[in-house]
Amino acid sequence: MRSVRALVSGHVQGVGFRWAVEREAGRLGVAGWVRNLSDGRVEARFEGDPDAVEGAVGFCRGGPDTARVESVDVTEVEPEGADGFRVR
């Protein structure tokens, strides 16, 4: 099990980024959540199989076509025991 926090910077709000992350996390079988931050970034928590978590982080690095990702800062964190994945 791997658990990470990802902070995504760039043009990532108002472009469907969170919903695209939710779909990709579901496809990968990753648990956690994603939300907008007041400073314009998006924060996500991913928990699950290490390869699946890496896939979710990789998706954030590219994002949907409507987004322009400038950077993704990833930090290893303690698991929250999330069940499923949701947009906050």
Predicted regions, residues:
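Intrinsically disordered, low-complexity, mixed-charge
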Residues: 1-88
